[in-house]
Amino acid sequence: MAGVAALAAGCYTTARLAWADYLFRSDTLESITRAAQLAPADAEYHLRLATLLDANGRGGAAIESELRRAVDANSRLAAAWIELGLRAEATGQAQQAEAALVRAARADHMYSTLWTLANFYFRHNESEKFWPVARRALRIGDVAAYDPAPLFRLCWKVSTDPATILERAIPDVGPVEARYLEFLVRENLSPAAEPVTERLVAFGGEQDLHPVFVYCDRLIAAGEADRAIHAWNALCWRGLQGYRPLDPDAAPSLTNGDFSAPPVQHGFDWRTPSVAGVTAERFGLRMWINFNGHEPETCDVLEQYLAVAPSRRYRLRFRYQTDDIAAGSGLRWRIFTPATGEIASDAADLASEVETQGSVWFTAPAGVLARLVLSYRRTPGTTRIEGRIAIQSVSLEADQ
């Protein structure tokens, strides 16, 4: 008889739990209330009941009671601890709130839980407790699953000292440093970016380096030559395409002049602007630029920023060959400075059906940056060109 009773009790328990599960899935206030009564040891039932009570405007005491039942049933249910913590904070019980949020962070090491605790410390001006939690959150490193920018922004509200933020909050995790560099550039905080760049280049993987290129571009656009060169050289020291670091005072600086590597389209490498009617293709240590006759009358088709010594005289050397491009068409090298526009040179239009050597003399501007451009300006009285040019063996020499 004892066995029969035990079997019956087991069947009853199974049926009761199955019915409770059915009621839980119905997801109404009434059904989940009954489910929690049938299975009081199920923490998820109590947590969901607390949520529905809140949504239905029920009293705070009933909600907290269900949350307490949830953590009693499962002390590692972080969501319930978080709700208890936030409710305690809302009623001015800061110590109880902190205790609950700390319990949540111990039970669940996910970013959202740590973010909630970091936010609590920020709201209560407890910076010494904020920094370790912020760093723990960022060390998770899964920036594809969450956006760390709000936490970066919180760090800058806690302190405006870039060194403090970098040392106390930003871990040596490549993806996190990459996102932090993106944040600094986007928020116009570039002056704080240089040490971040150095650490990102040191600790990041190849897939993390794109923000360094964007940062370098931003510095070039702002005319901050020295910092742009420093960022670029950090990439070169990392082994970027086998490129040599730039040192305009010691040697002429032109990158990838033999086109042995695909241009990265950033920094001090070649860029091929997107122009309707024009295509660029690297092939056989040459850069081929094709014009289909429908290109704009004025367009830049190949360019590179040069790091030059101020007021020094330079000679650009190159080899080229054209197909179906007439003399005097308006296709030539031009050199620009960010401050004053095009600078004087002895550049001539390019047209030669056989491979030939060309050169352009120019004097560097007062600044350190110049922009070398292969540019088309349709000559009056001519039709738009329909042909191609191959550029190779580009080098820059300083006049001794």
Predicted regions and their residues:
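Extracellular and organelle-lumenal recognition/adhesion modules and their flexible linkers in secreted
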Residues: 1-17, 171-178, 183-400
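Structural signature of tandem alpha-helical TPR/SEL1-like repeats
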Residues: 21-33, 55-69, 90-103, 125-133, ...
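Canonical positions in the second alpha-helix
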Residues: 34-35, 69-70, 103-104, 137-140, ...
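Short coil turns that delineate tetratricopeptide repeat
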Residues: 38-41, 75, 108-109, 141-146, ...
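TPR alpha-solenoid repeat register
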Residues: 45, 80, 113-114, 147-151, ...
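Canonical tetratricopeptide repeat
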Residues: 48, 83, 116-117, 154
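TPR/TPR-like (Sel1-like) alpha-helical repeat modules
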Residues: 127-146, 156, 160, 171-174, ...
